[in-house]
Amino acid sequence: MKKKLIVGNWKMNGGLAANAVLLKALKEGLPEGGNAGVAVAVPAVYLAQAQAELEGSAIGVAAQDVSQHESGAYTGELSAAMLRDFGVRYTLVGHSERRQYHGETDAVVALKAQAALAKGVTPIVCVGETLAEREAGQTEEVVKRQLAAVIHQVGQCINELVVAYEPVWAIGTGRTATPEQAQQVHAVLRAQLAAASQQADRIALLYGGSMNASNAAQLLAQADIDGGLVGGASLKAADFLTIIAAAQ
C-alpha cells in the first residue's frame, strides 16, 4: 500500500513561542513507525526554528513558496538553493492564494516547480477551480490546464512531483468537496499523469480543501487520494494528529 503524505500549511500564522509549543506537541504525538509521511509548511522566517525543533523527528519541513529564479535582483524572493540550506524537503507551488493575490500564472508555477526540482526540493503543485468555474462545468478543463503546464516544464522529472487538488471554493470556507467529488477530480489528474508517466501511480495526489479531523478518514479512503494538504486544522496539534492517524 502506498504511503500517505500529510502536509500542514500554516499560511501566515504562528509566532516563535506558539510554534515551539505546536511543534513539540506534534513530535510527541506522532505515532512511532507510522505509515504516513508528515511535513509542515511554515512561514519562511520560521524555517530555521522548525528545522531545529524537528531535528531527529520524522516530520519534514516545507516552504510555502519558492522563486523561479536562482539568484539576483528579486527583492523578497527565496531561491530553491536557499530553502535547501535550511533542510527544506518540500515547497508548495501554485497555491490558490498565490495565484489569486500575487497573479501567479500557470507558466510561473511550472517554472517554480522546475526550479525546486533542480535543487532537490520536492514541489507540491497545487491545482484547483473556483466556484464559478465549477458551476460552469469547467473543473476538469481548469485542473488539467494547470497541471499540463507543469508536466510540460519538468519533463522526465514528473515522477518527483507531488500534486495537490485544492478546490478554491472549499479553502477556508468550511465547505468541503464530498469524498466522491474529490475522488472524481483526483481520478482525472491520475489519468493525466498516467498519459505522461508509466509510474503515475507512485505520484502522490493530495486533497487540499478544508480537510479536518472529522472528514479526513472518508477523504483518505478514496482510491486516488494519497494524502492531504491541511490548512486551519494543522494549527491545532490534536486535530492535525487525528488527521495523521487517519492516514496510517
From Swiss-Prot:
EC class: isomerase
Compartments, as annotated in UniProt: Cytoplasm
GO cellular component terms listed in the entry, alphabetical order: cytosol
Pathway the protein takes part in: Carbohydrate biosynthesis; gluconeogenesis; Carbohydrate degradation; glycolysis; D-glyceraldehyde 3-phosphate from glycerone phosphate: step 1/1
EC number: 5.3.1.1
Binding of substrate, residues: N9, W10, K11, G172, S210, G231, G232
Main location: cytoplasm
Catalytic activity: D-glyceraldehyde 3-phosphate = dihydroxyacetone phosphate
SUPFAM superfamilies linked: Triosephosphate isomerase (TIM) (SSF51351)
GO terms of biological process kind: gluconeogenesis; glyceraldehyde-3-phosphate biosynthetic process; glycerol catabolic process; glycolytic process
Subunit structure as annotated in this protein's UniProt entry: Homodimer.
Family affiliation: Belongs to the triosephosphate isomerase family.
Function: Involved in the gluconeogenesis. Catalyzes stereospecifically the conversion of dihydroxyacetone phosphate (DHAP) to D-glyceraldehyde-3-phosphate (G3P).
Protein name in UniProt: Triosephosphate isomerase
